[in-house]
């Protein structure tokens, strides 16, 4: 198996500059090893694409907006659009996994379709992520699709096959996701604050920074800044 050394480039706001696999299709698919990251820890980052992880062997801790879950062999996770996240191993143990990033624009055929079927998923504040276990039938279908994304990545018609499977997975997710507390809830403001502050740190890491400077970048007090970090 060829493992790609995973290098991650971040923008000032801590969003990832995703290097997609196809010039015209926002699709990124890799098989990786956690040991390829410094200290078995990926950088904390976010992106508009949804992230899909399937663990082939070993296990991985995963931090989503400060919530830590354990993904074991045969399990996976879907991380929703715009969430701060990273994978790591507390014990520096090896983990072999598939990582897939798919941008929802792949499914946005029209404004009505985006409004009715895409936005209700990516704006669902009750679903920052979905841990997938094979014991739950609909989770198992999603896990099969994540493996299929990887298996189809070298096909002559890979973007077509992957987008078709993405639409099928999206349908399952749409039908089974937890209900959002409100149709029009704004994005979690704390996440916006964290993005602003991490962006400030990223931009000014070579300079001397105080807690006050970082808090000011998030337009919050120093005690709230400490609590968020």
Language-model segments: residues:
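Acidic/polar active-site rim loop that often engages polyanionic ligands
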Residues: 100, 121-127
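Ligand-binding loop in jelly-roll beta-barrel domains
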Residues: 82-107, 112-113
């Amino acid at each position: 198996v060829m493992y790609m050394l995973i290098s991650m480039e971040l923008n000032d706001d801590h969003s990832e500059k995703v290097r997609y696999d196809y010039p015209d299709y926002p699709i990124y698919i890799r098989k990786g090893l956690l040991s390829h990251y410094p200290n078995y820890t990926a950088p904390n980052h976010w992106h508009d694409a949804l992230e899909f992880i399937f663990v082939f062997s070993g296990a991985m801790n995963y931090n989503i907006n400060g919530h830590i879950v354990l993904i074991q062999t045969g399990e996976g996770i879907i991380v929703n659009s715009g969430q701060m996240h990273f994978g790591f191993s507390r014990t520096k143990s090896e983990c072999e996994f598939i990582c897939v990033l798919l941008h929802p624009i792949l499914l946005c055929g029209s404004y009505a379709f985006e409004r009715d079927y895409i936005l209700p998923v990516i704006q669902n504040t009750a679903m920052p992520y979905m841990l997938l276990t094979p014991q739950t039938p609909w989770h198992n279908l999603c896990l099969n699709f994540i493996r299929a994304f990887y298996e189809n990545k070298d096909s002559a018609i890979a973007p077509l096959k992957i987008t078709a499977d993405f639409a099928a997975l999206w349908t399952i997710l749409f039908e089974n996701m937890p209900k959002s507390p409100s149709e029009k809830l704004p994005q979690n403001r704390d996440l916006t604050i964290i993005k602003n502050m991490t962006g400030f740190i990223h931009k000014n890491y070579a300079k001397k920074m105080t807690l006050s400077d970082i808090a000011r970048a998030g337009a919050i007090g120093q005690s709230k800044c400490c609590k968020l970090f």
